[in-house]
């Protein structure tokens, strides 16, 4: 775990907290993507998510400006869809994931995006940020979805787009910084704002003179009572 000791700094521990939901078919690599982002390494074995798992990490959008990302990893199986829907309401951002080596997973993205759009909450659901992410970009010999197809879909739906690899780490950090920066842009423009009772976007907290700040938080199984803080 990467840890920073911070002293003589009375600024906020983080300026904002963004809650993001990660959606897509089962086995597209959602959990592997999140584990690489939060742990800095590829998961050798990744069992299918049951219900919803929770991850978190602090990132710096610009020098001295930190945001905390809460990341909800949802199960792709149909039997868990009702559970997934309940998490949309408290999300400010949606990462729609497909596997570049599985065309069917790409064809299902439109349904996932529609479902998310219908269930998002907050004061301005239409202003919440969507981003399309293709996984397994290193597996060119098995590719079934061209980069241009993902790019076209994203442009049509007015989404950001990026391809990643949880095997090599290519573009993993960039994917999360990209969506966080777009959320921040909308906050700065007044399109998104924190409101009581909505967990999607929250203002930061202050820290004491000296604290130990963990940059990476490891996943917790929500079924085991993971907190939503």
Swiss-Prot record:
Q: Which residues carry this modification: Cysteine methyl ester?
A: 229
- Which CDD domains does the annotation name? Rab39
Q: What is the deletion mutant like?
A: RNAi-mediated knockdown results in reduced survival in response to oxidative stress induced by sodium arsenite.
Q: Where in the cell is it found?
A: Cell membrane; Cytoplasmic vesicle membrane; Golgi apparatus
* GO BP, sorted A to Z: autophagy; positive regulation of response to oxidative stress; Rab protein signal transduction; vesicle-mediated transport
> Cell membrane among the record's keywords?
yes
Lipid-modified residues of type S-geranylgeranyl cysteine are: 227, 229
- InterPro entries registered for this protein in UniProt: P-loop_NTPase (IPR027417), Rab39 (IPR041818), Rab_GTPases_membrane_traffic (IPR050209), Small_GTP-bd (IPR005225), Small_GTPase (IPR001806)
Residue positions binding GTP: 73-77
SMART domains reported in the protein's UniProt record: RAB, RAS, RHO
**GO terms assigned for molecular function:** GTP binding; GTPase activity
* Protein name (Swiss-Prot/TrEMBL): Ras-related protein rab-39
């Amino acid at each position: 775990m990467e840890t920073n000791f911070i002293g003589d700094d009375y600024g906020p521990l983080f300026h904002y907290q963004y809650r993001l939901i990660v959606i897509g078919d089962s086995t597209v690599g959602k959990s592997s993507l999140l584990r690489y982002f939060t742990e800095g390494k590829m998961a050798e074995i990744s069992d299918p998510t049951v219900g919803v798992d929770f991850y978190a990490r602090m990132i710096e959008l610009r020098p001295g400006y930190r945001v905390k990302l809460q990341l909800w990893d949802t199960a792709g199986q149909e039997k868990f869809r009702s559970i997934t829907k309940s998490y949309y309401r408290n999300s400010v951002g949606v990462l729609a994931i497909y596997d570049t080596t599985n065309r069917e997973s790409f064809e299902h993205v439109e349904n996932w995006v529609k479902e998310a759009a219908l269930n998002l909450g907050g004061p301005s659901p239409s202003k919440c940020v969507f981003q399309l992410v293709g996984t397994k970009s290193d597996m060119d010999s098995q590719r079934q979805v061209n980069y241009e197809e993902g790019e076209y879909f994203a442009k049509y739906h007015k989404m950001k787009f990026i391809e990643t690899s949880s095997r090599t780490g290519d573009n993993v950090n960039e994917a999360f910084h990209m969506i966080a920066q777009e959320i921040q842009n909308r906050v700065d423009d007044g399109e998104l704002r924190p409101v009581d009772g909505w967990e999607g976007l929250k203002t930061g907290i202050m820290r004491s003179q000296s604290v130990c700040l963990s940059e990476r938080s490891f996943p917790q199984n929500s079924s085991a009572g993971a907190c939503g803080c």
